[in-house]
Amino acid sequence: MGNTETTSRSIRTTPIFAVLLAGAFVAFLNQTVINVALPRIMESFDISAATANWLSTIFMLTNGIVIPVTAFLMERYTTRQLFLFSMGVFAIGTFICAIAPSFSIILIGRVIQAIGAGILFPLITNVIFTIFPIERRGFAMGIFGVAMNFAPAIGPTWAGWIIETYSWHTMFYIIAPVALIDFLAAIFLVKNVTETRRPKLDVLGVILSTIGFGGLLYGFSTGGTKGWTDPEVVTLFIVGGVSLILFVWRQLKVGHPILEFRIFKYRLFTLTTIINVIVTMAMFSGMILMPIYMQNIHGFTPLQAGFVLLPGGIVMGVMSPITGKLFDRYGAKWLAIIGLAITIVTTFALTKLQTNTSYSYVIWVYTIRMFGMSILMMPIFTAGLNDLGLSLNRYGTAMVNTLRMVAGAVGMAFFVSIMTNQGEAHVKSIMNQEQISPTDKAQLALAIKQGTVMGIDDAFMIATYLSIAAFILAFFIRKSGKKEEAPMQKKAVKKVPQLQ
């Protein structure tokens, strides 16, 4: 058996949890502010939108490399080592972004940020499941959900105000010291709460994972702009797909896999993971399409659009701990069913958007939609990991975070592609029906605006169908029979069983 870390009852969970939440909040905040800053960064470095978008793309690609190996890292290194490394690296990356004199330097900063953030999220989830007993995990994950949801809610609005008042550099100058303070607090407050071993790193698996996930993520991020039949995009999908097939095959053969695919033998985990992936894709429809609608159709600035979407994010943050308490008492099934029912109705309501839809309609529908999402997201995630038990939790955390990352990338590319293709088709149809001449700029602009809205409506209809599919699957959720206690509640930690 490997080294067993501290498992005493004397360890206080509150200070550890508080430091973890602070780290999660600042990292989630960082993820949502970059898109608001892109126009000003383009001006500062005199670069194109395609070049500036690499600040988002490189962060996603780095996450795609780091997140799949987090299960190995959590088994190999202690809680303190990993958290201090991830927060320290994140703080350094943020400071580099703040002082960046050129685009290449800020790009390097984003890579370093992503390395820290990619480790941070799976690590925090694993620690929460370790220090809290099963009957309190729902509430604990709900509190974690406050950071996950509230930071993205205020991020765009806060960043928009900072950038308009000061500069995009200031945004990073504020985030960096907060991350540093959390790093310093972790030195004194974060204890080792999990078990460590000395597993052998599957180097070939890491290479295949990097090529596979990196190829697919980059393919989806560029397919919407270059076209899905572009030779580069097709090559990325082929190379990425073949690499992932080889990666899965190898992970089923090696003794210490990077991602443990045999956890899909657990029925509830598999079911909730499928629902999680579907809901993540559906959620990204609103995250990507609503800002486009508010800015391109109503002429809002990013800051104004952020204010419109702010209530929905706040509702998600407020509801997270409440939903966690309800999950601890009633389980995930009916929370998922109710949440998905609300999501279906409100997503369908967004298929009725027009060029003159009132602001109040958009705010209310989007906010209620986020309320529905808040009821189901954390319960299905927690229920799936509970089904695995603590011994396999790190594998489940790495797997779900990896699949959600892929689902987010696919969702963004998928819905933007639907909006674009359907929008162009609607514009042509409107021009033919109204007999609009391409030289009539006023009528052409009106047709483009109307066609774009119709394309957005079509994309939300697909999101509605996805929500219906998840709703049907939710009826098959059962309550996990596992009652495994957190190691800190035990006198000893059991050895991790090997899946066969």
Predicted regions and their residues:
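Transmembrane-helix exit segments and adjacent C-terminal regions of multi-pass membrane proteins
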Residues: M1-L20, L385, Y395, A442-Q500
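Helix-boundary and loop/linker segments of multi-pass membrane transporters
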Residues: E5-T13, A98, R198, K226, ...
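Flexible interhelical linker loops that connect adjacent transmembrane helices
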Residues: T7-S10, F183-T210, L252-R267, D328, ...
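N-terminal transmembrane alpha-helices
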Residues: R12, I16-V36, S44, T57-P68, ...
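12-transmembrane solute porter fold
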Residues: P15-L29, I34-L38, F45-I58, A71, ...
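Helix-loop-helix hairpins in multi-pass membrane proteins, especially solute transporters
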Residues: M60, I67-L204, P231
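Juxtamembrane non-transmembrane "cap" segments at the membrane-aqueous interface
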Residues: T420-K441
